[in-house]
Amino acid sequence: MDLSRALKLDATPEGVYGLNMVPAGETTDLDPRSVIEANSRVVTAGAGLIISHPKPAPSFGGQPVFYHDDALVRSVDPAAFATVADGTDAPLSPMPIHDAAFGWATTPHQAFRAKITRADHRAVGGDQLNEAFMIAVLRGLGELADALLLQAILAATPAAFTFGAAAARHAKYDELRALVGTAGTGAEISGDGSFRAKGVLAELTAATDKTVIGLFNRAAVAIRPELSVHVKRLNVNGDTELIVFANAQAVLPNASDFWTA
């Protein structure tokens, strides 16, 4: 399955409709990227979604070589200028550039596996299972993006959120977003009716039990554009097994751009 191309959904039979209510006798294009983005809380919060094909390897003639090509996500802080008295050296400032490299060859594998029985195919809506699984897989990639990035952030044991800490990271208030996990820590409905955590605009996520606040626009998730889909017949009863393999990873240039509630 190629995530960089539109996917065709067949017309629905009479009386059975899918999520986007396709009229009988028509087809519609499903944009994989749009579905993934719509179902990823970290992307909605500002994180980049990288879906791009590997760059073709250059020609090295007849020489045997090992070739590895990495991509880069870079976050750039403002340069720290300081007042310098006459005759003194300029002070050494911290490096304002934060890089995170990744490559498709080293991206981890993720898999989804499901069993489809003959009864599932014969039930009402069974002839739409292919389209339903296609949508489920794309939505699952959105939640996979959430899980990978939030795991990477929490693995760095972020500090407790304060507005002062956000200011120290050159943040604007409008850049900050919060994702409230299953424990609901710090969640509240403000006086204007908006959902917030520690005063920051928030959204719910099932990818963690923690509440993460940060500058998601300074991070990304990379998903390899091809999915490997395997369908296997299990027995003479008509049961089949569906396995989908993906490659995705979080790309986090600077974990200090995130905090917990």
What are these regions (language model features)?
Residues 1-4, 12-13, 124-131, 162-168, ...:
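Alpha-helix capping and helix-coil boundary motifs
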Residues 1-16, 86, 260-261:
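Short, intrinsically disordered N-terminal pre-domain segments
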Residues 7, 11-31, 146-165:
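Short, surface-exposed recognition loops or helix-turn segments adjacent to catalytic cores
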Residues 14-43, 190-261:
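Sequence/fold signature of self-assembling virion shell proteins
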Residues 18-108:
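Assembly/oligomerization interface modules of large self-assembling protein complexes
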Residues 54-57, 126, 130-131, 186-188:
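Short N-terminal helix-initiation segments at or just after the protein's N-terminus
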Residues 94-161, 233, 238-246:
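Long, contiguous amphipathic alpha-helices that act as assembly "spine/axial" helices in icosahedral shell
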Residues 143-187, 191:
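Internal, well-folded beta-alpha domain core
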